[in-house]
A protein has these predicted regions:
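Structural recognition of the beta-strand scaffold that forms the well-ordered cores
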Residues: 49, 71-73, 113
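Conserved alpha-helical segments that form or flank metal/cofactor-binding pockets of metalloenzymes
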Residues: 44-45, 49-63
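Flexible, surface-exposed loop regions and adjacent strand-edge segments
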Residues: 66-67
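Non-catalytic cell-wall polysaccharide-engagement segments
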Residues: 2-40, 57-58, 75-157
Length: 157
């Protein structure tokens, strides 16, 4: 628990440096706290980068075309619960990882499957996943971690 708070402080500082001119500090730091607590096996910077690309950390964002909502742009019954939205995003990442492991693919596949669903992954990558990886690498460098590149997605057996 203490580790999550330290992570959230580092991440909040990095988010303010990276996005403080376009997103309110309160929204950035709230997102940092939630991300640090729900990240589990995922790098918090990766979840923050996804949330930034999906909604600019807006917990009330709604995509009328896809029916997704919240900072992580997911579908869940607990609409309006910001923590549940982030947890649903983590669950969606796990599902995407399982799909990509079966295909023998890595991080780009996971991010593409998160963004468009497993059915949307057709071997042709678009700019979205690469942008998320760049955002995550930038946040890692701003949090003061020694390794600046996003860590490889761990594969489950």
């Amino acid at each position: 628990m203490i580790g999550a708070w330290f992570t959230s402080l580092r991440l909040c500082s990095a988010l303010l440096a990276a996005h403080g001119d376009e997103v309110s500090p309160a929204r950035l730091c709230r997102a940092a706290v939630i991300v640090a607590h729900v990240a589990d096996e995922w790098p918090p910077e990766l979840l923050a980068a996804i949330s930034y690309r999906e909604s600019r950390f807006d917990p009330r964002a709604v995509n009328a075309r896809t029916g997704t909502w919240g900072a992580m742009q997911v579908s869940t019954r607990r609409r309006g619960d910001e923590w549940a939205g982030y947890r649903a995003g983590v669950a969606k990442l796990r599902e995407a990882r399982r799909f990509c492991v079966r295909r023998g693919e890595g991080e780009l596949c996971v991010l593409a499957a998160y963004a468009s669903g497993p059915a949307g992954v057709r071997g042709r990558w678009y700019r979205g996943p690469r942008r998320v990886l760049r955002d995550a690498a930038r946040l890692k460098s701003l949090t003061g971690r020694r390794h600046g590149a996003p860590q490889e997605v761990r594969h489950e057996a």
